């Protein structure tokens, strides 16, 4: 086992604080509407330019291992805030830096670290309750657009696009962000259920001008198996041909003789058929087939539940108003499934979302909810260069997370004002002893830090602005974009309550751990092994001449 380097008490805390400051100073320059850019070097390609706090934090690794531990713990604050609310990473970092700096000063002055932590926790718990009381529901699209605009660094077009997307697909709908092809941002909305599987044979195409298969009021056969023998499908095909409607087959695969026969029947006009593979893999494929069955009012023909394809009837088939299939995607529009069954299925998937542990699973489940509940919107980000595209895409994603958080828990006045108001409301809070009171004061002072940093970034004097804002009440604050005072909510400067709450809670949590740190342990740096060329007696062979 490698030897360890151990530091105690003040030595450890000073090193840790130095690491915290390096990371926080790099992140906090991006805060506010006049936040600066940070340029990140990449080992290949052009450097990345960003104003996204968590992107900056992720890039930072320090050479000194003790300092790096401090930096990594604050990075954890940014990541946690990002995971919980999708935004507020810079605010969380600024809060954490302030609590750690003031807290460590108090520890150095002889205060008890555990009591300080208790005081900080008490203040934060009270602040969270006050934040909830200040929160205003965010329901109309104007408020949603304002939240999106603020989070996208005052880019109004992004705010409007997100509000429009939410109008189209609902609050629960899936909104994804992709690279666009032009200079303008665009919004694409896919109505109905779409999945990433195209036609199995180009011979199914009946709209050559668009290269797509369009089926009007088709029957939909859902099979959880490979279909290679046409005989087992004959009863269904005959029944569909009699009904005079087209048929869409969604199965694990359709191959060989079965596919060839379907193609021939389609080309001869005997029965209009198209076949696609079922979306997903393994258990997820079974679940998605069941989703489609619920949406279209059909049944999944599965041998697991004792159903055979030969015995399938028209009652087992789903139906939809229209189906459009192209090379890569299939879209089912207006399935005839019962609304109650669809809502039941959505509720069931929501329950799974609550229990999901990984982000990937949660995202996939949310996509399934959206496909059942209404549709998917795609925001295509336009930009002149790839560097600008990356930067803008990160901002749009942030704005999207912020608007979701706003719809969930409501909004408070932005620009750091909500925390100032909360701090003034809990200013009389007292702990059980003097050290806890100092902890409460540390937390209250930290709540001013975001406003001060926003003001500093736009080149004004933080103390003057902070005192003016404290002198006002309600939503009165400082608009850093226009450099004027007024009602923040009326000016459209809003922060999602969830973002502000998460930032404060995670900052206090990690800062509390760091204040109560008494010892740090890390591996000693390995001493470089001697160069083999210089080792041994070989280098000294030249001296052998003296032996003669």
Curated annotation (Swiss-Prot):
GO molecular function terms attached to this record: ATP binding; ATP-dependent protein folding chaperone; isomerase activity; unfolded protein binding
Record family assignment: Belongs to the chaperonin (HSP60) family.
Pfam families according to UniProt: Cpn60_TCP1
Catalysis: reaction(s): ATP + H2O + a folded polypeptide = ADP + phosphate + an unfolded polypeptide
Entries under NCBIfam families matching the protein: GroEL, PRK00013.1, PRK12849.1, PRK12850.1, PRK12851.1
Gene source species: Salmonella arizonae (strain ATCC BAA-731 / CDC346-86 / RSK2980)
Keywords: ATP-binding, Chaperone, Cytoplasm, Isomerase, Nucleotide-binding
Cited CDD domains: GroEL (cd03344)
UniProt GO cellular component terms: cytoplasm
Subunit structure: Forms a cylinder of 14 subunits composed of two heptameric rings stacked back-to-back. Interacts with the co-chaperonin GroES.
Role description: Together with its co-chaperonin GroES, plays an essential role in assisting protein folding. The GroEL-GroES system forms a nano-cage that allows encapsulation of the non-native substrate proteins and provides a physical environment optimized to promote and accelerate protein folding.
Localization per record: Cytoplasm
GO BP terms, alphabetized: protein refolding
Protein name: Chaperonin GroEL
E.C. designation(s): 5.6.1.7
Binding site for ATP: 30-33, 51, 87-91, 415, 479-481, 495
InterPro entries: Chaperonin_Cpn60_CS (IPR018370), Cpn60/GroEL (IPR001844), Cpn60/GroEL/TCP-1 (IPR002423), GroEL-like_apical_dom_sf (IPR027409), GROEL-like_equatorial_sf (IPR027413), TCP-1-like_intermed_sf (IPR027410)
């Amino acid at each position: 086992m490698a030897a360890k380097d151990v530091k105690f008490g003040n030595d450890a805390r000073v090193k840790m604080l130095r690491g915290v400051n390096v990371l926080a100073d790099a992140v906090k320059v991006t805060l506010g509407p006049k936040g600066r850019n940070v340029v990140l070097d990449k080992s290949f390609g052009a450097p990345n330019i960003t104003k996204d706090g968590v992107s900056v934090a992720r890039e930072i690794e320090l050479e000194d291992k003790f300092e790096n531990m401090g930096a990594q713990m604050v990075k954890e604050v940014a990541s946690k805030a990002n995971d919980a609310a999708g935004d507020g990473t810079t605010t969380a970092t600024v809060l954490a830096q302030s609590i750690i700096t003031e807290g460590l000063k108090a520890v150095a002055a002889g205060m008890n670290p555990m009591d300080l932590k208790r005081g900080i926790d008490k203040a934060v718990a009270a602040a969270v309750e006050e934040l909830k009381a200040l929160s205003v529901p965010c329901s109309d699209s104007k408020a949603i657009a304002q939240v999106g605009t603020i989070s996208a660094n005052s880019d109004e077009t992004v705010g409007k696009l997100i509000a429009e997307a939410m109008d189209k697909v609902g609050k629960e709908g899936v909104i994804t962000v992709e690279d666009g092809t032009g200079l303008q941002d665009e919004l694409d909305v896919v109505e109905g259920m779409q999945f990433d599987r195209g036609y199995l044979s180009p011979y199914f195409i009946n709209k050559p001008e668009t290269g797509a298969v369009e089926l009007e009021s088709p029957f939909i056969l859902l099979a959880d198996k490979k279909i290679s023998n046409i005989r087992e499908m004959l009863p269904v095909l005959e029944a569909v041909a009699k009904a005079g409607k087209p048929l869409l087959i969604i199965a694990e695969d359709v191959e060989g003789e079965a596919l060839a026969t379907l193609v021939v029947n389609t080309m001869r006009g005997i029965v209009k058929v198209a076949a696609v593979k079922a979306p997903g893999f393994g258990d997820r494929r079974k679940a998605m087939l069941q989703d489609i069955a619920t949406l279209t009012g059909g049944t999944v023909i599965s041998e697991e539940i004792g159903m055979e394809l030969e015995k399938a009837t028209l009652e087992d088939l789903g139906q939809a108003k229209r189906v459009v299939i192209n090379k890569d995607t299939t879209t089912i529009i207006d399935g005839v499934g019962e609304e109650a069954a669809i809502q039941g299925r959505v509720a069931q998937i929501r329950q799974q979302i609550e229990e999901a542990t990984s982000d990937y699973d949660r995202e996939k489940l949310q996509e399934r909810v959206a496909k059942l509940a209404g549709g998917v919107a795609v925001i295509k980000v336009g930009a002149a260069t790839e560097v600008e595209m990356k930067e803008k895409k990160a901002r749009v994603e942030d704005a999207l997370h912020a608007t979701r958080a706003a719809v969930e828990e409501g909004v408070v006045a932005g620009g750091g004002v909500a925390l100032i108001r909360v701090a003034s409301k809990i200013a009389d809070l007292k702990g059980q002893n003097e050290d806890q009171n100092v902890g409460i004061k540390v937390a209250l002072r930290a709540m001013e830090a975001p406003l001060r940093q926003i003001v500093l970034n736009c080149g004004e004097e933080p103390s003057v602005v902070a005192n003016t804002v404290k002198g006002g009440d309600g939503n009165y604050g400082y608009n850093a974009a226009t450099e004027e005072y007024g009602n923040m909510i009326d000016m459209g400067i809003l922060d999602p309550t969830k973002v502000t709450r998460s930032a404060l809670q995670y900052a206090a949590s990690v800062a509390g751990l760091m204040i109560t740190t008494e010892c740090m342990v890390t591996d000693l740096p390995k001493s470089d092994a001697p160069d083999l060329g210089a080792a041994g007696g070989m280098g000294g062979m030249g001296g052998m001449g003296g032996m003669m």
